[in-house]
Amino acid sequence: MYKRQLTEAGLLPGEDVHKHLTGCGQAILLAVTLGPGVDAQIRRAGVGDIAAGVASDALGSALAEQAADAAEAQLRQWAATAEKYLTGRFSPGYGDWDIAVQPLVAAALDTARKAGLCVTDTNLMTPRKSVTALLGVSDHPVKGQLAGCGHCVLRTRCEYRKRGKTCASE
């Protein structure tokens, strides 16, 4: 999609996502999900064994990120053959890109019909082990806005960082 179309559709509120797309005339939205079976397995693992539930949840998160990495790798192969350049992934909830855009991202990708991926009234995805993201597309090399703690508006009061972790590792 063209960056202008995403902006007009209300998908790009906030400054951080615009910084991420600096130099990009287009962007790609992506969504991946491990499906409802993984959510069910995590629940079953946690019955009577909290540690197994926590471990299963962490494994599911890691697998969802690996699925997103695989999707991104396919997009990078396409970009190389099309002589295009991509930024890294930037997901709703990064920086000031409000998680409230999640329903708009899901609607733009028609995730409910195509992948069974829905968004709750509180902007959480179901199945839980799912990832949505945006990558900028350009005709020249671009870096995009770096994601992570150094650029997060919550970095000074983040509960994850207080425990020596990051939200990406949860």
Named regions from a protein language model:
Residues 10-13, 35, 93, 127:
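Glycine-centered flexibility motif
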Residues 82-160:
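Short terminal or interdomain "cap/linker" segment that borders an active site or interface and mediates
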Residues 17, 38-42, 59, 75, ...:
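Generic structural signal of hydrophobic/aromatic residues within well-ordered alpha-helices
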Residues 6-22:
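Active-site cofactor/substrate anionic-group-binding motifs, chiefly glycine-
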Residues 1-5:
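Conserved small/polar residues in nucleotide/adenosyl-binding loops
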Residues 22-91:
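Conserved mixed alpha/beta catalytic, RNA-binding, or beta-rich assembly cores of soluble enzyme
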